[in-house]
Amino acid sequence: GYDFENDRDFTSVEQFASELNDWLSTRGYRNLYAVYGCSMGGSIALMVTLEQRIKINHCIMDGGITPYQLPWFVTRFIALKDYLMMMLGRVGGISLLEKAFATDEYSKEDLQYVVDVLRHCSRKTLWRTFDSCNNYRVPEPVSDINTQIHYWCAKNEEKERKQDIAYMKRKFPQTEFTKLPDLG
């Protein structure tokens, strides 16, 4: 969905994690020191870990997104809002991104890359990104894992990640939390 050299649509966090585990397994990986993911990548890292097809010592979620704990119809409205914002960014280009988001820490080249990615992605990929990332299914009950989970969060995004942190504390009490200095 996001790869300029592959026009496949993104499907879901769960499927991407499963395909990543397949890829690693077919190449002979049986043990990884760590998996790392930022934001949506944190969701994928967690799901790769929870499948337990490969022994993983550390799962690092850097501001990782956890499933919403809201009624299904509410999550649809949130996904729709996020999707429409991305579609506006896709149509409006850099000038709209600069107006809609805090872009002080990004160069024109960075912003152009974001626009290029948004324009490359299909509408289906963009919708599925928000729908899946906010609603992926963590196994219930969570089976015991021998992986140390780490949740990193920048000090200035702590409020934004409050629900994710609470979810991780509730579902994965063994998680080690690290507050990073003012970043991201």
Residue ranges and their predicted role:
Residues G37-G41, A45:
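Gly/Ala-rich beta-loop-alpha elbow adjacent to hydrolase catalytic centers
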Residues G1-A34:
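Active-site loop/oxyanion-hole signature of alpha/beta-hydrolase fold enzymes
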Residues V35-G37, D62:
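Short beta-strand immediately N-terminal to the catalytic nucleophile in serine-hydrolase-like folds
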Residues I145, Y151-C153:
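Short beta-strand/loop motif that positions the catalytic acidic residue
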Residues I165, K169-G184:
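Catalytic histidine neighborhood in serine/cysteine hydrolases
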Residues L50, I56-M86:
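Flexible "cap/lid" loop of the alpha/beta hydrolase fold
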Residues L70-W72, R90-S143:
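Conserved alpha/beta-hydrolase catalytic His-Asp/Glu region
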